[in-house]
């Protein structure tokens, strides 16, 4: 009986991993964000490494806007299978 439970658990883990992998492929993040559209992710004086540790983008080339900001999430359309 224990082996059947182990197989069920393994199958559920495998299905969950595949589902999460598909979701991860469907979205990608980019640090290409217009300065006026940046959403603050840091605090005054945040360093590039502190910002990166939060999973955010750092760009201090534009004054008056957040330097540590959330990346844009872009939906990537799934690849279509070609039928020959």
UniProtKB/Swiss-Prot annotation:
Subcellular compartments: Secreted
Tissue note: Found in stomach, with highest levels in the upper gastric mucosal cells (at protein level). Detected in goblet cells of the small and large intestine and rectum, small submucosal glands in the esophagus, mucous acini of the sublingual gland, submucosal glands of the trachea, and epithelial cells lining the exocrine pancreatic ducts but not in the remainder of the pancreas (at protein level).
Principal location: secreted
PANTHER family in alphabetical order: INTESTINAL TREFOIL FACTOR-RELATED, TREFOIL FACTOR 1
A GO BP annotation: response to peptide hormone
Residues annotated as domain P-type: 29-72
Assembly with partners or alone: Heterodimer with GKN2; disulfide linked.
Effect of residue 55 to V: In a gastric carcinoma sample; somatic mutation
Gene3D superfamilies tied to this protein: Spasmolytic Protein, domain 1 (4.10.110.10)
Impact reported for residue 32 to K: In a gastric carcinoma sample; somatic mutation
Lineage: Eukaryota, Metazoa, Chordata, Craniata, Vertebrata
Domain of life from the UniProt record: Eukaryota
One Gene Ontology molecular-function label: growth factor activity
Protein name, entry field: Trefoil factor 1
Alphabetized Pfam families for the sequence: Trefoil (PF00088)
Keyword check for Transferase: no
Organism for this UniProt entry: Homo sapiens (Human)
GO cellular component: extracellular region; extracellular space
The protein's role, per its UniProt record: Stabilizer of the mucous gel overlying the gastrointestinal mucosa that provides a physical barrier against various noxious agents. May inhibit the growth of calcium oxalate crystals in urine.
Keyword Disulfide bond: yes
Xref: InterPro entries: P_trefoil_chordata, P_trefoil_CS, P_trefoil_dom, P_trefoil_dom_sf
Signal peptide range in chain numbering: 1-24
């Amino acid at each position: 009986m224990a082996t059947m439970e182990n197989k069920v658990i393994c199958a559920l883990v495998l299905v969950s991993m595949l589902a999460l992998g598909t979701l991860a492929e469907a979205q990608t993040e980019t640090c290409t964000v217009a300065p006026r559209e940046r959403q603050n992710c840091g605090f005054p004086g945040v360093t590039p490494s502190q910002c990166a540790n939060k999973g955010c983008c750092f760009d201090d080339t534009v004054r008056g806007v957040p330097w540590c900001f959330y990346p844009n999430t872009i939906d990537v359309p799934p690849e279509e299978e070609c039928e020959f």
